[in-house]
Amino acid sequence: MITKFFLFSIVLFFTQMLSGGWYIWQRQWIEAVTQAADAVAAEELFILRAELEITNNEWQWQRISIPEKYQTSTAVLRVPAQALHNPEKLINELYHEITSLKTKKIQFDIDVPESQLKHYAQILSLLKMRLPGYELSITLLPCHLNCQESKTVIQAVDWWVLQLHGITVPTHRKEKYQLMDRTVVATALKKARTTQSQFKIALPTYAYVLSFHADGTFRRLYSEGFSGNGDTSNLELAAPDLQFIASIIRANPDIDLLWFRLPVKNDRWTLSTDTLTLLSQGITPKEKLEQHNKIEGNTLRISFRWCHQIPLHGKTATLQIPPEWREGECILLNSVALPGYIYGTIPETIQVPPARCGEEIPVAIITLRKPKS
């Protein structure tokens, strides 16, 4: 009983010590999204609720339907920067959209050019006056803190988020690219503290997939909704640096943390909640490809689990099999044996396909020819 209680206490401790909040960025709330949200419902959720689209001067909101129980969570509204050029219309659009929601907590996500920060601050101030009793927050990038006008923007809202992730898209495969620049992040955190304002930091759980043409020139960037199946030779990955993220959390224990975005079962390009639990403690998880053996009578089922990593390519793994199972018949699943493999025999090594972080992939079934005594 002591052991069980001790283990339960550890699990409870790590569950309680997860982040201060999660962004939910899915446009379709399928069952997997609801299940993921339910698992972290005790924490603060920042849910994408609507995106403003402007086409040929026509303004239209693309709204996202979410379960009733989450409609009082913080609503995130995405707005294109071009909307700032028509402040009166934008304020009216935002006012009507906000007052149609059941929450009093609103966050604006706008990729504001530095040259428009002063303009943005004026819009926020006017909107704040029209929405007494509402909690308004915004997201800012490190580049915004280089501008004096950022202080005015910050003063116009209740609090703000420093987004510490993003990527400068390369023009060629040979160029360097990363999800978080160490120098930029360190400078931004230092400047954010000098604002003497309430802010939180947003750290990435996701990876970008970059696609390149045969000549190496950049083709396309994927952040979600990409399967990654098939030929991956023209792809590269910009993944979270676990060591760097853990160091940020250790060095800034007084700053609330938000994760972007909430891992969902069908989201191939995010870290697992197991990984994020460790990171939230300032612990750097060790990447590994973990083998699991499960015996069911005369059958041995072998699977692998990608731990604490977002794999783009498959990996060669040596099968660890108990000696008494070496004489069995083998059927490969979701895996490829290396050259020289004879069907039905047990290969020494296999190629494990890439999969979602933390997901267990069946790779082989071994059956004994004679009943196991």
Give the predicted meaning of each segment.
Residues 300-313, 321:
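Asparagine-centered strand-capping/turn motif at beta-strand->loop junctions
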Residues 327-364:
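Intrinsically disordered, low-complexity Pro/Gly/Ser/Thr-rich segments with frequent PxxP/GP/PP motifs
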Residues 22-27, 36-40, 48-162:
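Chitinase-like catalytic core of GlcNAc-active glycosidases
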Residues 118-224:
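Substrate-binding surface in catalytic domains of secreted glycosidases
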